[in-house]
Amino acid sequence: MKIKSSEFIISAVKREQYPDDNLPEIAFVGRSNVGKSSIINSLTNRRGLAKVSQTPGKTRLINFFLLNKDFYLVDLPGYGYAKVSKKEKASWGATIERYLLNRGPLKKVVLLVDCRHKPTADDVQMYEWIKHYGYEVVVIATKSDKISNNQIGKSEKLIKETLGLPKDHKLKFFSSLNKKGKDELVDYLFDDLVEEV
């Protein structure tokens, strides 16, 4: 499919601020600085759609973007940034959990992990959280331009083992820089959402 239009709709904290038109949603979540904003901009062909911050932990709200006027891409706050207070970390966690809890229009959650590193305890917890709430999980390993083709297999094994992914889980590797395989990834993520509309 092609992303023909993308627009920012709202930054939300409370449930009553979420869009209520019942269009399908796909949420993106990951550690601070995993490249979440960059991948959203890359997939939507809009360089400034999601704000790319040099400061980790900057995204503290839930941002809703309407794609093709058919479905929402939802940018959840980044987690795991060390230089914030425990109170602030708890607040981010509560914001994410509030969204995941009984969110009818949410069809799948994309968990982003950095392919250069072993997934953290926070990544594992997030994966378990998403499964607990009964959503389909798609795992994308970001920044794949930073490792060689020879390292891809080793990275895939480490990520799958650490997160406890099923053997048949289709782990996707992607780089927002070279955008290799972007069209296939867009189809993989969004096609079935469009079918539901």
From Swiss-Prot:
Cofactor: Mg(2+)
UniProt-annotated binding residues for Mg(2+): S37, T59
Disulfide bridge positions per record: none
Keyword presence, Nucleotide-binding: yes
GO molecular function: GTP binding; metal ion binding
Pfam families: MMR_HSR1
UniProt keyword terms in alphabetical order: Cell cycle, Cell division, GTP-binding, Magnesium, Metal-binding, Nucleotide-binding, Septation
Binding site for GTP: 30-37, 57-61, 75-78, 142-145, 174-176
Role played: Necessary for normal cell division and for the maintenance of normal septation.
Domain EngB-type G: 22-195
Record GO cellular component, one term: cytosol
Family recorded in the similarity comment: Belongs to the TRAFAC class TrmE-Era-EngA-EngB-Septin-like GTPase superfamily. EngB GTPase family.
Gene Ontology annotations of biological process type: division septum assembly
Keyword Protease listed: no
InterPro entries according to UniProt: G_ENGB_dom (IPR030393), GTP-bd (IPR006073), GTP-bd_ribosome_bio_YsxC (IPR019987), P-loop_NTPase (IPR027417)
Protein name: Probable GTP-binding protein EngB
